[in-house]
Amino acid sequence: MAQRTGLEDPERYLFVDRAVIYNPATQADWTAKKLVWIPSERHGFEAASIKEERGDEVLVELAENGKKAMVNKDDIQKMNPPKFSKVEDMAELTCLNEASVLHNLKDRYYSGLIYTYSGLFCVVINPYKNLPIYSENIIEMYRGKKRHEMPPHIYAISESAYRCMLQDREDQSILCTGESGAGKTENTKKVIQYLAHVASSHKGRKDHNIPGELERQLLQANPILESFGNAKTVKNDNSSRFGKFIRINFDVTGYIVGANIETYLLEKSRAVRQAKDERTFHIFYQLLSGAGEHLKSDLLLEGFNNYRFLSNGYIPIPGQQDKDNFQETMEAMHIMGFSHEEILSMLKVVSSVLQFGNISFKKERNTDQASMPENTVAQKLCHLLGMNVMEFTRAILTPRIKVGRDYVQKAQTKEQADFAVEALAKATYERLFRWLVHRINKALDRTKRQGASFIGILDIAGFEIFELNSFEQLCINYTNEKLQQLFNHTMFILEQEEYQREGIEWNFIDFGLDLQPCIDLIERPANPPGVLALLDEECWFPKATDKTFVEKLVQEQGSHSKFQKPRQLKDKADFCIIHYAGKVDYKADEWLMKNMDPLNDNVATLLHQSSDRFVAELWKDVDRIVGLDQVTGMTETAFGSAYKTKKGMFRTVGQLYKESLTKLMATLRNTNPNFVRCIIPNHEKRAGKLDPHLVLDQLRCNGVLEGIRICRQGFPNRIVFQEFRQRYEILTPNAIPKGFMDGKQACERMIRALELDPNLYRIGQSKIFFRAGVLAHLEEERDLKITDIIIFFQAVCRGYLARKAFAKKQQQLSALKVLQRNCAAYLKLRHWQWWRVFTKVKPLLQVTRQEEELQAKDEELLKVKEKQTKVEGELEEMERKHQQLLEEKNILAEQLQAETELFAEAEEMRARLAAKKQELEEILHDLESRVEEEEERNQILQNEKKKMQAHIQDLEEQLDEEEGARQKLQLEKVTAEAKIKKMEEEILLLEDQNSKFIKEKKLMEDRIAECSSQLAEEEEKAKNLAKIRNKQEVMISDLEERLKKEEKTRQELEKAKRKLDGETTDLQDQIAELQAQIDELKIQVAKKEEELQGALARGDDETLHKNNALKVVRELQAQIAELQEDFESEKASRNKAEKQKRDLSEELEALKTELEDTLDTTAAQQELRTKREQEVAELKKALEEETKSHEAQIQDMRQRHATALEELSEQLEQAKRFKANLEKNKQGLETDNKELACEVKVLQQVKAESEHKRKKLDAQVQELHAKVSEGDRLRVELAEKANKLQNELDNVSTLLEEAEKKGIKFAKDAAGLESQLQDTQELLQEETRQKLNLSSRIRQLEEERSSLQEQQEEEEEARRSLEKQLQALQAQLTDTKKKVDDDLGTIENLEEAKKKLLKDVEVLSQRLEEKALAYDKLEKTKTRLQQELDDLLVDLDHQRQIVSNLEKKQKKFDQLLAEEKNISARYAEERDRAEAEAREKETKALSLARALEEALEAREEAERQNKQLRADMEDLMSSKDDVGKNVHELEKSKRALEQQVEEMRTQLEELEDELQATEDAKLRLEVNMQAMKAQFERDLQTRDEQNEEKKRLLIKQVRELEAELEDERKQRALAVASKKKMEIDLKDLEAQIEAANKARDEVIKQLRKLQAQMKDYQRELEEARASRDEIFAQSKESEKKLKSLEAEILQLQEELASSERARRHAEQERDELADEIANSASGKSALLDEKRRLEARIAQLEEELEEEQSNMELLNDRFRKTTLQVDTLNTELAAERSAAQKSDNARQQLERQNKELKAKLQELEGAVKSKFKATISALEAKIGQLEEQLEQEAKERAAANKLVRRTEKKLKEIFMQVEDERRHADQYKEQMEKANARMKQLKRQLEEAEEEATRANASRRKLQRELDDATEANEGLSREVSTLKNRLRRGGPISFSSSRSGRRQLHIEGASLELSDDDTESKTSDINETQPPQSE
């Protein structure tokens, strides 16, 4: 990153400091406090920590102030861990909810980070201040970068769209949406700035004359449009009051080739009035502030307060100067290419708009007529616009209007005049704005390069909600609604449809964001019509007002879900629409006027005829406006006809805007949209303030959360199979075999080779889909792979170059040796006399032969020169011909290119027109058939309608025949009059259409006459060129075919003209027939209905004929355009050289033939021809003007043709939409009809059944009431049971909470053991804890839901039982009906009971509704939990992805480990080889030592031979003094011997150097071996120590865990004791056991997750080891580099030694020369001076050489030894030299040698100095670099060791944790076993209790039997007593027996009975009294 200076650092507003965010303290605080989000009125959401859970409510403590509050569980939202703070993409959030999204946006906004990704789109919050993040440096930062490589920015979105456009060849669009003031316009400008910088064409093109002109103009288009189209509003200081779609075209290489701007709905009413504290358009204030005095006088400008249209005067904008902005606008216009006249004309129009507002009218005293008391302002206005003042005043005050067929002057009222002036001002400004946009498009589209694709930038007016909103706000909000629907459809519907279309696994998710109902409310054409359709419909009706429009709207749409009546502003607003951004109240004031946009056509005509060409150009289409007379006629009968006088060309503002919006939507659907959601932070326009509720509302409306969710759950990235294989096959080189393979199979193989998690991708039919981030990961791996390949390629290239350089050096070295050897040989031979003789004699031997050869060569040379001159001539001729042919070829190529271009254009135009014609014909046929079908359906509906009306009429006649007849007659009279008026209006319309057709016919006849006149002029020209024609008749024959084509087209034109005339006459006849029919209608009122149908049918026929006529006219225009194009092409070819005459002759022939045809047809043309022959001279002069006008007409015809085609296509689209709506409405009506019929039947059945039931229920209601009370009792019991179950559930939940608390305690203990693992382990534990809580909560809710469902089922069963009882009662009621007929009072009581029962039923239904509401609430909770579960599943997928990545890293690490093992083995082999080489070098050193000894012996032998030779030489010199020549030869031989000695010495030194080098290498190897051994020993020792430490830690952990296990056992015992208290109910215990089982499963899952985490950490440890090994490998590589550098140093030393040897050799020669000079000085005194001078020079050289020798002492020592030896030899030689007669020759020779030696010495000195300095500096630099590398590697090695120690420590902790988890698992297993045992024991107890109960039941049954026996005995005794009594009465035998106890025993016939005395007495008395006299 470049170093930045200054106060404002851009990185502060782009990047997040992750070191601050990854703070362990905040992470621990978050984990400990269990932080969540709760709702807050002030902050939206506040952070709080959970303290206690109380059922459905939770006690929380606010983090900010510590206050406590009770919050419902459903209102709590989870908080993300602190590591997700300020995350760049909100799709990465773990907990996705509104609170987290708002908190993230708020944190980033307060940190200056305004851009945030939200899945696939970007969210930007308006900062309300300037940020330094839009400079060119920032653009370069984002250029060419992928989205995930840089922080969020609008530049990243632009870069992504630009790259997608280039790669996919797909058009892109960037949609900036949001409310007004959210920053859409500014972001649009930044997009254009980025694209203009990145895709600038001048950077890569040399043919651009003005660098970047197009880009500069593109950038300057915005300031111009903002000046004329933006204004200050309450919400925004630079609010766009129009919409624009900027289309930037690019060529195939990505350069900008042009641009185009489309605008939508300028708010022109702002030009005449503004709301409070708002301004009009900027240009007015800029002009009044920035214009100079001269300009002000020209434009007649005044002060701000002098203009009525500036409602609020001058309101400055903070931070902006209107004067400076005016200068910028003018500069932008100049850059855009506006001329000075154009700018001045525009400013005149702006000034005239202000002058319109100053025109004042006055009401006349006695009439309502308006008058203009002072026309000063009118004079100024007319001066500016080029009009006549009197005509303007007359047109305003008394305009001419059409009444019937005549025009009359109508006086205007003051209100009408004011309205007309305001309408003209608005229309003038709107036309100026349209012209400005057209002019900018013309400047931007001037290039001829064809755009391959485009990027569209949409900047539309933002959503606006004012207190009262008008028609402009409706259009703006309608547009934003459509854009939001496009976003929803693109993000949610199309995305999921593509999943289903590709056949991947996907469950369709309905996000509930369909805005189509609101859009239909606004734009639906019928059934029922929408707002715009009703507005258009009201515009067509006479006497329609805004009030009637609102009434009709309420009538048609009052029941719509998105339509409401205003509640707050009932008196002010008219209706309310519920948009996606909120409710908007609309006031329908002047909506009909705004929709029609009427103008004073008298003034418009004056403006069209203005003397100012610019103003006339603005008002050129005055025939399309709606006149004010038409609007004023709305209250009269002529309004309808006046409104339709323009041949159907008039379109309302709503229709035009709707159609343009439809086109925009179609364009956007054909592009790949990139959404930028702009958010407004506050309404005060304050920086640094964010209103949370406002932002939340915008996020909800924009579907941000849903977009993030589908991005996370879906597969947003997709790529086709072929592209995937082509792009990522580099990652799987051997996965796909050679040969053909299907794309899908290849992708599947690649995916398997990439080892991707199956959850991360889906394979469709034609594409492969990826989750978010996967494709970016593959891109990174691909980049890394390519980087590795490039690095390897570079290494191979460097190796190749190094080997090549080494081979070259080897060749140079061998060449140097050859040169040295040859030089040495030459030095030996050059003083040898025979050599001199040989060199002198040898050339002489070849002289004679050379002369002969020279003569032969001269002859050959002459021949060759002759041939050369001949060939050069031929070559010049050939070059000349070649050049000529090239020129001809270029000319032909140009001609061919021009012809091909013309042919291609013509062919393309023909094909396009033919396709359009075919398409339009098909559409026309389709529409005709559809119209026929619709007419048939309409006829059927009309018949049905008539039947219904007849039925209604019959009913009305039955009620009141007399009144009905009178009303019917009155109604028929009124309808007949209305229809007669309507038919009259239609007749007037048809008459106007007929007149229009006549005018067009005349226009076409005039154009044909003009064409014929032009042909005659061309004929005159052809007569003048008749002589030339004779010369060019050959060319004419080639062009006869084109002439025939011209004749055919002319004949077709004539046929079309005649056809048009015939159709016009037919139309006139049909109009006459219609008039006759209307007369008949007036006479025959009784048959009005049938005649109306006939007239409507004929009207449809007329419209068909009209369309056909229009089609014919368009075809004629197209043919004329084709003729004109052919004419232009011929004219262009005529302008070329030597072709003008031929073209004229061709035209002559064509004109002749056409003239002959015209002479044959009419005699009038003959007269015209003679007349034109007389005027030929004048026509020649006017030819150019006529051609220009002709071209203008052709252009106009083209434009009209294009507009006609567009209108036809729009009509077709409207017809299609209308037909589709009709079909939909028909289907809806049919379904409604069926539903109503079914409902009627059902209601009838229900009525009959209810009556029947009422009669049956009257009798038995009391009994039913008793049953109902029984049902109530059952319900109460069920409620008690439910409460009991709820209490049990609460108990179970408390137990679960206790278990969770214990689990939390265990997690905290584990966290204490894992404290050094810091953030990661704590996060994982917290996530698992949350998952456990969530799962337990889900289970609890599911149990509650199941209990409620059971309760509901029980109630349903009770209800069914009641129904059965009711049925039984009904059956009984039929039987007892006769009995209760007389009991009327009972019936009344039953009625009251029935009412009471109904009340009870209502109470029950209310309770049922409450239960349903509770169920709905549970369903909502379930959906919320389901969403959270989805988020957790996404996180789980993310964790799985991480695990798979770690597994991949493990595999890579294994591969690296294997490679390292191979490398270590290779190093071992190299070590063995090095040892072997060392041994070899030792042997070699020994052999070299022996060779050295042998060399020394040879040298001694040579010295001995030398001494012998010297002795011989002395003898010879002493014997013969006259043989000086022999002395010289002997000296030569001595020198040769000395040279041999020197060579032997050098060889000896080289051998010594090699020996030393081998010894050094041996020492280095030994040192390396010792270091490696020490390293291995240290590694082994550290591993042993680590293992021992791990063992000790594990033992310690085991002990600690045993203690914890004991504690757990105690706690478990306490838990079992508490459980025993809860063992009253077996079901409660089973629920607890089930919960414990589930908890065990969760714990086991957690254990598995922790084991997986342990594996992950082991993988990380192994990765750390791998990194350590890599560091070691790098250190070894650096050692290798060091060795190579040492080898280079040795090589340099060798080169230094060789240079030193060369220097010694030179010094030796110098010494020899010095000795010879000294020896010769004894004989010749004359040479002493020269000798002294040479000695001084030699001494100087010796000093310099001694300075050079100071760096290498060893070499100097050797050099001194050798010099001493040489000196001794020289002294001996000098003593032997006694002869002086050769001194002169010797002196001369010495002088020559001295000169040569001087030159050599100078060269050697320079070379040696430079070489020594260069080598020394290079070596010093290398040594310094190596030392730095060594230090760096030492630091890295220390860091790696530290990292290894840290990871090993972490590994120990992980092992401890694993052991803890294992112990926990064992504990849980033991607990589960105990629980199972306890459950078995309880089951046994239950069985025993059941047995006891059975025993008790048996005893009870036994007692019951005994009791029954006793009762039976008692009954028997009572019977006996009764028999006894009877017998006593009869006087039977009775015997008594007394006992001691006073009791007596009574014996009666064998039976005995004990009685007391009293009893006996009483009994006997009774018996005696009742005893009769005995008969026996």
Swiss-Prot record:
InterPro entries: IQ_motif_EF-hand-BS, Kinesin_motor_dom_sf, Myosin_head_motor_dom-like, Myosin_N, Myosin_S1_N, Myosin_tail, P-loop_NTPase. The modification Phosphothreonine is found at residue 1960. SMART domains: IQ, MYSc. The modification Omega-N-methylarginine is found at residues 18, 1930, 1940. It comes from the Eukaryota. The modification N6-acetyllysine is found at residues 442, 1241, 1301, 1645. Keywords: Acetylation, Actin-binding, ATP-binding, Calmodulin-binding, Cell adhesion, Cell projection, Cell shape, Coiled coil, Methylation, Motor protein, Myosin, Nucleotide-binding, Phosphoprotein. Its main location: other. Residues 1967-1976 have a biased composition (Polar residues). Residues 85-783 form the Myosin motor domain. Residues 1126-1149, 1697-1718, 1874-1976 are annotated as: Disordered. Residues 786-815 form the IQ domain. ATP binds at residues 178-185. PROSITE patterns: IQ, MYOSIN_MOTOR, SH3_LIKE. Residues 661-683 are annotated as: Actin-binding. Belongs to the TRAFAC class myosin-kinesin ATPase superfamily. Myosin family. The rodlike tail sequence is highly repetitive, showing cycles of a 28-residue repeat pattern composed of 4 heptapeptides, characteristic for alpha-helical coiled coils. Myosin is a hexameric protein that consists of 2 heavy chain subunits (MHC), 2 alkali light chain subunits (MLC) and 2 regulatory light chain subunits (MLC-2). Interacts with PLEKHG6. Interacts with ECPAS. Interacts with KIF26B. Interacts with LARP6. Interacts with MCC. Interacts with CFAP95. This is Myosin-10. It comes from Bos taurus (Bovine).
